[in-house]
Regions:
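Short acidic-glycine-tyrosine-enriched beta hairpin
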Residues: 44-59
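Terminal helix-turn-helix DNA-binding modules in bacterial transcription factors
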Residues: 163, 182-226, 242-251
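Basic, amphipathic alpha-helical hairpins
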Residues: 104-112, 126-134, 148-161, 180, ...
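Generic protein-terminus/edge-of-domain signal
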Residues: 1-37
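Short hydrophobic/aromatic patch on the recognition helix
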Residues: 52, 176, 180, 224-225, ...
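Ligand-binding loop in jelly-roll beta-barrel domains
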Residues: 60-88
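Amphipathic alpha-helical segments enriched in hydrophobic/aromatic residues interleaved with Lys/Arg
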Residues: 83-153
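Alpha-helical residues within the helix-turn-helix
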Residues: 167, 178, 182, 215-216, ...
């Protein structure tokens, strides 16, 4: 797809566990999951892409995509043009934009440009009007935390309490605290809570039952998890899903 002669090429595929590694494209890309959930790492920021969000990546932007469950993967590749966005965007996807993405992802690779124009114009209009999303997690870059971060990204461990993390990396609690405040703008406890929240959203998008999410994230009970989620989002998990058109999750 990096060698486009014009127009848009789409990819639609069902993918399981996948780590793309950091890479770049010579063309613009839109990433979207019709079902399931992806995370995308851009610089030292991690963004969540459930079915209610899409990421616009201009040509040349290094990124890494991780899928920990089954994802209905959609990717659109665009020939760089002045009228297309030149900066990274993570946007909310309404029902119309969702259907436009699906149509473009499924059309033939040899579809004539003239037959793409109306759909592409509607796509650009909807993308320009889509609200920006802000749920993200800044990552520390200190080398002492590198191996620990990789284990977390792979889902092998959860972010532990501060004293246990300090023991793991051979640093003091205060040193770890300073690293997180300097490199993420958050104290470690706030960072850990933000990580748990985004991981909960990811699991909800993958249709994991609330009881299993509560256990996986080491909450003392389902009600403790629901209270935590509501405290941070203002909504219960199921109300959050309903508000975003992701209400297929079991309770």
């Amino acid at each position: 797809p990096d060698r486009l002669n014009g127009g848009v090429i789409g990819i639609a595929s069902a993918l399981g566990w996948h780590d793309s590694g950091q890479h770049v494209h010579q063309c613009h890309q839109l990433l979207f999951a019709q079902a399931g959930c992806m995370t995308i790492e851009l610089g030292n920021q991690v963004y969540l892409l459930p079915p209610s969000r899409a990421a616009w990546l201009p040509a040349g932007v290094p990124h890494q995509v991780l899928m920990r469950g089954v994802v209905a993967y959609r990717s659109l590749y665009f020939t760089p043009q002045p009228e297309l966005p030149a900066s990274v965007q993570v946007v909310a996807v309404n029902p119309l934009l969702r259907e436009i993405i699906e149509r473009m992802a499924l059309w033939p690779w040899n579809k004539p440009e003239a037959e793409q124009r109306l759909t592409l114009a509607l796509f650009m209009e909807e993308l320009a009007q889509a609200p920006q999303e802000t749920w993200q997690l800044p990552l520390p870059t200190d080398a002492r935390l590198g191996a620990w971060l990789q284990e977390i990204k792979r889902g092998n461990i959860l972010p532990e309490r501060l004293n246990r993390l300090a023991e793991r990396v051979g640093a003091s609690d205060k040193t770890i605290g300073r690293i997180f405040m300097k490199e993420t703008g958050m104290n470690y406890q706030a960072w850990r809570q933000q990580w748990r929240l985004l991981r909960a959203m990811e699991l909800l998008a993958e249709a994991v039952p609330i009881s299993r999410i509560a256990t996986a994230l080491e909450f003392s009970s389902d009600s403790a998890f629901i209270s935590f989620f509501k405290q941070h989002t203002g909504q219960t998990p199921l109300r959050y899903l309903n508000s975003r058109g992701e209400s297929h999750q079991p309770s």
